[in-house]
């Protein structure tokens, strides 16, 4: 900026000199009566010589201009963190490698000349080598090259910018690959004063024709509109930073690169109308009761039910008096399993600009009533048939008299009386353009408005109302779709209950908003029913919990061929047990990919993915490590910190897990104090304190040790109850014995281990003896063993730790 005035003045001076010179020349031509055509010849010659001279001196400027002209016809580039690029001085640019044109994105974002590092096998091709040499390309091989490393160091020392992609290869799965240590070797001979490392992250090219995503995913991502590309540059790092430190920063920068896309997202209701209009004749849902439902029918009914919901609210004259930390819109209760009815009601509630609250029908009457009171729910959409099924299972729900139950069966009868209106609506949906439908039915574009309230599992205490806005949910859907490489021919099994974030976001909203067919099945514990639904409909993506997947693996009626169509199986909501992973893979020949998250993160934060083998370079693109919960999703950052002072810990050091991302919740309903405890803003990112203990390895894979609340302090040592359960599982038959470890206070040792065991009377004593006589560490051996009828579980299949501890206390008296 200081030199800008001098540059402009100098430019104006030379322009004036040139104009004066040509004016004098034109005067001479007139005086001596020379044909004016020769003047134009002379001007053309001067222009040609000048252009050739500039091309020789500044070839990169011409290329940058040409790139911009060509690139901006198809793409729109947004640069975040440009202020972190030094105006002068040496720097090493390090970032992710997602496509063949990443170098072009970097060069267009930075006006300075950049020396790019290129794989020697590409550089050596004779027909491009001569051009690459002109632009100072630095060739390097995968085995390393002393000359190339010295050249990189030389350019940095001379004050130039050098760009290197430390993965050394294009990503095959959209995630970061292993960072090679070549740049560390290049910087060894440099001092910290010679330059800095500038990390960067590119978003928007995964799924393009220039990436190595699969054909089906690329086909889904083709668009006639300009593709939005974002590149985010981070703050300067020391030149001698290690590869795992740089990779961690690149991961965090993905948050900034995703920022513009997430901020520009529609509401869920508007996104639904767009998707439905694009796929009117396609099947949206196949329901076990309702049959095949097309997008045309689904959109028509969702718009019609929206009127019904608004009318009911008006009739009931509902005007909730909200607290200071609660949304102003009315909350509508939904008490339905995974089904067409549930999906339709959720969409209609959002179109009506209300808040959807999917109630946990397995939580017990006390917890259910507390949730209804906290959210100030006056009306609940449910089904008589479903309530009868719950009653047959011993779940009797008694609602207060001020709660209005609206049964889906009655809605169906009401709709039958209005067939003409519904038919008219269907015609309108078919004819009217998407933008007009949105302006009529969903005029609000505020993606920060609260969309849903989900009550947390309550596995360790009272359920908390988690407020998620439209941006939270749409961001997480986009992230998940990217890493799963969703295809047009994918079919997703929707069997997880919608009161769980995993079921609502991943198996309910994702297929509907991504234009993917879903198969609804209301009971995930019905192994044979699930398997039949998968086999009959060629399901390709199945999500479940360790508990549910274990049920399928142990069921003798299920055959491997029933799950043959599955291309990916994802486990979440609870830790995937080793025996479940092994048994499932042996029986069905399908790997389970474990993920991680929380209701507070909408829910997915990280997930394992299939590994890819690169035959060009004989490399494994590793996206799956057994025992881990995968790498953070694109746009998500994970930090491991000291729980006492929030200082960052190094790779492989256990600490408190923080999750940052656009999917981090707004807060807890009517509980700002608790929200402020678990959500902290650091470096411009909102971080959620998970309460989990774990670590990141050098490649960025996340490993969970246990929850901090699931540690017992015995004789001064912190012992993980989860680790105890893993050790015990090695010595007993987990197919016939279920167990859970908890801890109780002890006057001498601080705490003592209690083991609750679910098994037959005949084998209880044998199980206890097997554990007592095993070679597990003495500190891991329980003090008390209690036989119980059934391990308490939540609706998601997770162990109800709160009830387990209460049960242990009562038994120990």
Model-inferred region functions:
Residues 405-455, 462, 485-491:
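Conserved pre-ATP/AMP-binding loop-to-beta segment of ANL
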Residues 308-363, 495-497, 718:
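Conserved AMP-binding/adenylate-forming
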Residues 408-409, 751, 775-799:
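AMP-binding/adenylate-forming catalytic domain of the ANL superfamily
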Residues 589, 621-626, 646-647, 664-691, ...:
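Conserved ANL (AMP-binding/adenylate-forming) active-site segment centered on the GW(Y/F)…HTG consensus within
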Residues 420-430, 539-544, 553-624, 637, ...:
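Gly/Ser/Thr-rich phosphate-binding loop
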Residues 474-491, 499-540, 555:
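Conserved AMP-binding/adenylation subdomain of ANL enzymes
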Residues 81, 157-161, 174-242:
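A cross-family acyltransferase "interaction/gating" segment
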Residues 380, 542, 661, 666-667, ...:
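AMP-binding/adenylate-forming catalytic core of the ANL superfamily
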